[in-house]
From Swiss-Prot:
CDD domains per record: CMPK
Reactions it catalyzes: CMP + ATP = CDP + ADP; dCMP + ATP = dCDP + ADP
Record gene name: cmk
Protein name: Cytidylate kinase
A Gene Ontology term for the protein's cellular component: cytosol
Gene Ontology molecular function terms on file: ATP binding; CMP kinase activity; dCMP kinase activity
Domain of life (superkingdom): Bacteria
Secretion signal span: none
Lineage: Bacteria, Pseudomonadati, Pseudomonadota, Gammaproteobacteria, Enterobacterales
Pfam family, one: Cytidylate_kin
């Protein structure tokens, strides 16, 4: 009998710190890593590259079904490869982020990408980063964590990130964009952004990233020991 690889799902809104937490957990446990948000960003970028309308579900489904994407972990960094090209930086632009949130609202697009996401489940285990990992993609995951933070704190973190990269940003505008995206993600008809019933809800608003990692790893190790 083939062993089923365990999965730790990390869900939550944009800017809560999921990416940093997932990389740290994957390194600590030596597990595979899936950035599901990157898959939607890659699809959005592929649509922009191929001049496919991101507002058209009919046009997006074939593209999603044949999306050539893979993840390569190098020296602790996750490289996102689209059609043989490293697009790790390109998918992180605000234009692609907004388009990704839009394409994620279509039920048939999400269905087309489900199989690709589930294919990342391999031994010794998988850390899955997203918005519906614990509720839709891996509902049988033995460990589920919902990482949250206030919209103000997430806007502040994003502002610091952008400033470090040399960008001039307006906090109020950034906060408005985050609130708008939260509203869209939490109220969409398919796979809305909500914690799984059996998830640990971890609020990172007043915690350092080291504290978040410590709490998440402690919880995961306890749950996996019982599984």
């Amino acid at each position: 009998m083939t062993a089923i690889a365990p999965v730790i799902t990390i869900d939550g809104p944009s800017g809560a710190g999921k990416g940093t937490l997932c990389k740290a957990m994957a390194e600590a446990l030596q597990w595979h890593l899936l950035d599901s948000g990157a898959i939607y960003r890659v699809l959005a970028l592929a649509a922009l590259h191929h001049h496919v309308d991101v507002a058209s579900e009919d046009a997006l489904v074939p593209l999603a079904s044949h999306l050539d994407v893979r993840f390569v972990s190098t020296n602790g960094n996750l490289e996102v490869i689209l059609e043989g090209e490293d697009v790790s930086g390109e998918i992180r632009t605000q234009e692609v982020a907004n388009a990704a949130s839009q394409v994620a609202t279509f039920p048939r697009v999400r269905e087309a990408l489900l199989r690709r996401q589930r294919a990342f489940r391999e031994l010794p285990g998988l850390i899955a980063d997203g918005r519906d990992m614990g509720t839709v993609v891996f509902p049988d995951a033995p460990v589920k964590i919902f990482l949250d933070a206030s919209s103000e704190e997430r806007a502040h973190r994003r502002m610091l990130q952008l400033q470090e990269k040399g960008f001039s940003v307006n906090f109020e505008r950034l906060l408005a964009e985050i609130k708008e995206r939260d509203d869209r993600d939490r109220n969409r008809a398919v796979a809305p952004l909500v914690p799984a019933a059996d998830a640990l809800v971890l609020d990172s608003t007043t915690l350092s990233i080291e504290q978040v990692i410590e709490k998440a790893l402690q919880y995961a190790r306890q749950k996996l020991a019982l599984a």
